[in-house]
Design a protein with these regions (language model features):
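Short, Lys/Arg-rich flexible segments
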Residues: 1-157
């Protein structure tokens, strides 16, 4: 370990806030991409429960028949043209990231309606990747403290 004077340590800590903000921004973007990728992956495949989000119900026979009638596969839940999947985006704020869609259909599917059971692909994706996000954010704080001398690998599972 390198010896550091008290003054050197104070200078190191003074730069910590700036490094933390920089690392936090990078980490939030990385975490948002992880959740966005997972949410897109879930479209078209039945999902089990994840935290407070229930497992997806089987599509109704009438829905399957309608899908086939319109030229789509019978049983790929939430996937028709791919437009809803492609609408999943993220935005970054100062200390937060938001992953979502501006599609009304995405809202109806995520939250459910009177006639459509909720099939959470955003909340479910966030729950399934929470451990990866926690690791990304934790590593970013460590990187800010120790600086670029040490690189810590982050798992993706």
């Amino acid at each position: 370990m390198t010896d550091m004077s008290l003054l050197g340590f104070m200078e190191h800590l003074a730069g910590f806030t700036l490094r933390l903000e920089h690392e936090e921004h990078k980490a939030l973007e990385h975490a948002a991409k992880v959740i966005q990728t997972e949410a897109k992956r879930e479209i078209g495949t039945y999902q089990g429960d994840a935290g407070p989000f229930a497992a997806w119900q089987e599509l109704a026979d009438s829905t399957k028949a309608d899908r086939v009638r319109q030229g789509f596969s019978a049983n790929d839940p939430l996937l028709r043209t791919g437009e809803m999947r492609d609408s999943i985006e993220y935005t970054l704020g100062h200390h937060e990231a938001a992953i979502g869609s501006n599609s009304d259909i995405a809202v109806w599917q995520e939250l459910g309606t009177e006639k459509i059971p909720a099939r959470s692909f955003l909340g479910g994706a966030a729950m399934r990747k929470a451990h990866v996000v926690a690791e990304i954010l934790g590593v970013s704080a460590v990187q800010a403290l120790v600086g670029p001398r040490v690189r810590i690998p982050i798992s993706q599972d």
